[in-house]
């Protein structure tokens, strides 16, 4: 699975302190005038297990959130195929659907491993556009769903999907009278699975992903002055890399991830 990494250079102001209230919410308020109709059939679970994530619903949400697709409501579906021989194209043409996605999930009893098989069809041309088997741990169901969304999006639009992207953003919470708590967080592109990377009583600014997504550079005022830090995402280990007078800001990684460009004013004016 390929992941992309983006930084949001804004503060998200959160005044409720419970973590459930602080989750990042991303909403698309306007899409195209004539969204593409697509039917995403619930994926058949052949082992009878109940999973923590609904892969088909993740795909529906992904495609609708970008504003270019309109998913068929489940209540309008007249059949629920889970393999190609069960697909009757006329049924989906009657429902005015251009595309159809079906799938099935298998989990061995007592195992955390899953096997997700999906197939994607062009209803009007009556052909299968894509299909494959994805395997992973049950904790990767969201990643698998986003990966399928990428395939569907690219097959239809010709543009690579970005649903496996991750975001960096900064949250400012009201921690009491005249007191703020700043958090550097990362999440899926849709705000799901937020993870706090750093908490501070002083401002945090300008988060920047390393090209391989394993580290993040940012500006922290924890010493009372703006200083640039680099932090490993997995371990949480961090190191201060600048301590110049005045401005130390705006870190940006080189394409190979070995260097950082930044704005400094150690000689009196920003460079």
Question: How would you describe each model-predicted region?
Answer:
Residues 24, 84-151:
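Amphipathic beta-strand/beta-sheet edge segments enriched in Tyr/Trp
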Residues 27-90, 101, 105:
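Short beta-strand->alpha-helix linker/helix-N-cap micro-motif
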């Amino acid at each position: 699975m390929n992941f992309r990494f983006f930084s949001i250079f804004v503060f998200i102001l959160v005044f409720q302190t419970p973590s459930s209230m602080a989750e990042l919410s991303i909403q698309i308020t306007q899409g195209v005038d004539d969204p593409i109709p697509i039917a995403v059939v619930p994926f058949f679970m052949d082992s009878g297990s109940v999973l923590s994530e609904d892969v088909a619903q993740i795909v529906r949400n992904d495609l609708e959130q970008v504003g270019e697709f309109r998913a068929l409501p489940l209540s309008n579906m007249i059949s629920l195929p889970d393999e190609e021989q069960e697909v009757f194209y006329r049924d989906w043409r009657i429902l005015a659907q251009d595309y159809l996605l079906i799938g099935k999930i298998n989990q061995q009893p007592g195992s955390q491993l899953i096997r997700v098989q999906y197939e994607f069809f062009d209803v009007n041309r009556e052909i299968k556009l894509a299909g494959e088997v994805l395997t992973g741990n049950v904790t990767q169901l969201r990643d698998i769903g986003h990966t399928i969304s990428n395939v569907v999006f690219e097959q239809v639009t010709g543009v690579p999907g970005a649903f496996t992207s991750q975001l960096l953003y900064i949250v400012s919470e009201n921690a009491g009278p005249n007191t703020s708590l700043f958090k550097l967080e990362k999440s899926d592109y849709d705000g799901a699975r937020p993870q706090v990377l750093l908490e501070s009583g002083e401002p945090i600014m300008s988060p920047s992903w390393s090209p391989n997504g394993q580290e993040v550079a940012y500006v922290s005022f924890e010493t009372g002055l703006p200083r640039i830090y680099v932090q490993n995402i997995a371990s949480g280990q961090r190191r201060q890399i600048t301590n110049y007078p005045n401005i130390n800001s705006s870190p940006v990684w080189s394409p190979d991830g070995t260097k950082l460009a930044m704005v400094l004013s150690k000689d009196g004016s920003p460079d």
